[in-house]
């Protein structure tokens, strides 16, 4: 079957840069979906995207849709005709549904069947509808109309290229008649560009100063920015989302180095970086020590004969932004950080939970409680908690909200606070996202956990837990943040105890009954989802959770040990044995003897298991006490043979009550050893 390349390019006014990549990938996905539904095979498809165009190139697309046979089954033949052979209403209704006469329907099988041969259509006849459907399904939150047209799109359409092979596909989409003329660079090549065939698309546009390949432009910008940064003896700060956005802003990228006055370097560099990245889309440069250099890189969309003019223009534009940041910083420094707390008394944290100042006071007390239990400095944590929200009332954070915590760090140092306290003001918001950096100090860890736990307790306490996909207070993220800090920093904290303390700080603002348990259960449940993401069996988590450990760090050590135990050859049999033992003990009526007495043994396997249990007990309990859970389970795995022999030779529910009690006591000791780590019986369910 013959095949040719297919190209579609929709030209428009400048597309939203932050959405360009997602629009392009969705456009490609929609076309691939349409081709698959139509049965049109192809070799490969890829998207291209630039500020004024979305394009898809499909290589080696078949020219003809394959023929199909449509089979429709109707009612059973017995129900389709009466005893005299006359058609029933069921048969007549099926014929009407198929749009044919009854004699055209096959009645030779168990059911009536109508088969129709559907010849395939030319690909060129199907492509317009496929493209239109893909455009209709693009993730555009708000479409617009332009002029007097009824068509809607994210931006007004300007032209349409649609080629199958070297032939134009005859159609009209978004009020644009398909042709082979695209447009070049707005300034370097403002004239139309003739696309001779799909395979020449990139080169035809390149000759018109347009790099249509998003990935190529992105790589070019990243490489050139890195080279220019090296020439300045620095390295560029290149966030992925900023690189994508800049790539979406230019068709012919030309990176240039600009500079600003060194006096601005007295301002916290995070503020300067923030304004240059967010407002101007510049790439900032750092020296070998991570300090901001007084220069930046802008990416022009034009190859100027006088690049110095572009450099001067960008330097002129950025200066007022940096001056504003400098002004806010100097204004804020005129007063002690703690004085900002007065303004927080009138700022609402949550209508039912009081002001931000009240939250800071609660966080302060809770942070001191936590710090004492994780080996930190309670007084530092109390002080850091009290100052934790002060910078929210500053001019700097008012202008740059993303600097909350960072501004507090600098203002705390300026006010003479210890480094440990100042750093905690920044670290309270850590981790700022999945996999993000954790607090480096115990004071920071204490304040970060206190802040998150206070929010969890408060929102749960007024009956507003997350429901389904709705989590307006980011409580799931807060819970995961607490867990990451505890587990990855190996901090031992009784979460339920901390939750009870947090509940007490709210007084009558929350419904306290059962609240601490509800919050700690919610936090631990986030671990289940985390383990699933990491490929750890849910049953490993449930086996440990059955013991209700209060420390997330301890729970994680146990889960990792159980997961390793599962890979041992003895694991499956011992899990089944634990399940059996659990059932036997659950059905036993009466009090178990305090000690196992060998005088009741009447079988060699009893002596063997008893001896193995005594040896295991001396080895396992010290290992468990030292939290060497993996070694403990490896040692318990050696019990498989004596346990198997015991159950083969011994009737646990003996008729003699004393013997029966003694045997159950030995099983209780066996189970108790495993419960030093986890309820292994869960693995056998």
UniProtKB/Swiss-Prot annotation:
Any coiled-coil regions, as ranges: none
Pfam families for the chain: DALR_1, tRNA_synt_2f
A cellular component term, taken from the record's GO annotations: cytosol
Keyword Coiled coil set for record: no
UniProt-recorded Gene Ontology molecular function terms: arginine-tRNA ligase activity; ATP binding; glycine-tRNA ligase activity
EC number assigned by the record: 6.1.1.14
UniProt keyword annotations, A-Z: Aminoacyl-tRNA synthetase, ATP-binding, Cytoplasm, Ligase, Nucleotide-binding, Protein biosynthesis
Keyword Nucleotide-binding: yes
Domain of life, per lineage: Bacteria
UniProt-listed GO biological process terms: arginyl-tRNA aminoacylation; glycyl-tRNA aminoacylation
Reaction equations catalysed: tRNA(Gly) + glycine + ATP = glycyl-tRNA(Gly) + AMP + diphosphate
Cysteines engaged in disulfide bonds, as pairs: none
Localization annotation: Cytoplasm
Protein family according to the UniProt entry: Belongs to the class-II aminoacyl-tRNA synthetase family.
Subunit structure: Tetramer of two alpha and two beta subunits.
Protein name per its UniProtKB record: Glycine--tRNA ligase beta subunit
Source organism of this protein record: Azotobacter vinelandii (strain DJ / ATCC BAA-1303)
Encoding gene (name): glyS
């Amino acid at each position: 079957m013959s095949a040719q390349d297919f190209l579609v390019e929709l030209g428009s006014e400048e597309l939203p840069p932050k959405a360009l990549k997602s629009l392009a990938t969705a456009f490609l996905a929609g076309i691939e979906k349409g081709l698959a539904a139509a049965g049109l095979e192809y070799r490969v498809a890829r998207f291209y995207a630039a500020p004024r165009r979305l394009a898809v190139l499909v290589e080696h697309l078949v020219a003809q849709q394959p023929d199909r046979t449509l089979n429709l089954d109707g009612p059973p033949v017995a129900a389709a005709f009466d005893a005299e052979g006359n058609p029933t209403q069921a048969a007549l209704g099926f014929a009407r549904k198929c749009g044919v006469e009854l004699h055209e329907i096959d009645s030779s099988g168990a059911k009536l069947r109508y088969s129709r041969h559907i010849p395939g259509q030319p690909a060129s006849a199907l492509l317009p509808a496929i493209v239109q459907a893909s455009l209709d399904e693009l993730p555009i939150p708000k479409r617009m109309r332009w002029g007097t047209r009824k068509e809607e799109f994210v931006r007004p359409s300007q032209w349409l290229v649609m080629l199958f092979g070297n032939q134009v596909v005859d159609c009209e989409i978004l009020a644009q008649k398909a042709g082979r003329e695209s447009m070049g660079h707005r300034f370097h090549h403002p004239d139309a560009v003739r696309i001779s065939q799909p395979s020449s698309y990139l080169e035809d546009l390149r000759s018109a100063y347009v790099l249509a390949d998003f990935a190529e432009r992105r790589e070019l910008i990243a490489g050139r920015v890195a080279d220019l940064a090296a020439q300045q003896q620095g390295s560029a700060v290149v966030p992925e989302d900023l690189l994508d956005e800049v790539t979406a802003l230019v068709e012919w990228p030309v990176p240039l180095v600009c500079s600003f006055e060194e006096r601005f370097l007295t301002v916290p560099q995070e503020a300067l970086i923030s304004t240059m990245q967010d407002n101007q889309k510049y790439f900032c440069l750092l020296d070998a020590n991570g300090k901001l250099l007084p220069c930046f890189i802008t990416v022009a969309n034009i190859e100027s004969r006088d690049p110095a003019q572009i450099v001067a223009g960008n330097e002129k534009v950025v200066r007022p932004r940096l001056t504003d940041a400098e002004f806010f910083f100097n204004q804020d420094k005129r007063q002690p950080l703690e004085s900002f707390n007065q303004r927080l008394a009138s700022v609402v944290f949550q209508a039912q939970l009081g002001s931000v100042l009240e939250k800071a006071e609660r966080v302060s007390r809770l942070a001191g409680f936590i710090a004492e239990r994780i080996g930190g400095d309670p007084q530092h944590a109390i002080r850091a908690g009290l100052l934790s929200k002060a910078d929210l009332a500053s001019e700097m954070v008012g202008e740059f909200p993303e600097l909350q915590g960072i501004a507090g760090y600098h203002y705390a140092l300026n006010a003479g606070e210890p480094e440990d306290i100042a750093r905690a003001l920044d670290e309270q918001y850590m981790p700022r996202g999945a996999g993000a950096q954790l607090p480096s100090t115990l004071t920071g860890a204490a304040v970060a956990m206190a802040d998150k736990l206070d929010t969890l307790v408060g929102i749960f306490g007024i009956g507003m837990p997350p429901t389904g996909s709705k989590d307006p207070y980011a409580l799931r993220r807060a819970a995961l943040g607490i867990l990451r800090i505890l587990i990855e920093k190996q901090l031992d904290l009784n979460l339920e105890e901390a939750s009870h303390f947090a509940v007490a700080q709210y007084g009558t603002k929350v419904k306290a009954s059962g609240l601490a348990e509800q919050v700690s259960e919610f936090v631990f449940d986030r671990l289940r989802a985390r383990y699933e993401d990491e490929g750890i069996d849910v049953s490993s988590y449930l086996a440990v959770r059955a013991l209700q450990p209060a420390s997330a760090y301890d729970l994680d050590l146990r889960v990792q040990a159980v997961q390793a135990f599962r890979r041992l050859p003895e694991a499956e049999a011992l899990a089944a044995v634990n399940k059996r033992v659990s059932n036997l003990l659950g059905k036993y009526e009466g009090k178990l003897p305090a000690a196992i007495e060998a005088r009741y043994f009447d079988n060699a396997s009893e002596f063997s298991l008893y001896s193995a249990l005594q040896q295991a007990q001396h080895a396992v309990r010290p290992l468990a006490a030292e939290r060497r859970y993996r070694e403990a389970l490896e040692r318990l795995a050696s019990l498989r043979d004596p346990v198997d022999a015991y159950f083969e030779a011994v009737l646990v529910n003996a008729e003699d009550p004393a013997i029966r009690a003694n045997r159950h006591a030995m099983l209780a000791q066996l189970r108790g050893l495993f419960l030093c780590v986890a309820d292994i019986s869960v693995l056998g369910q």
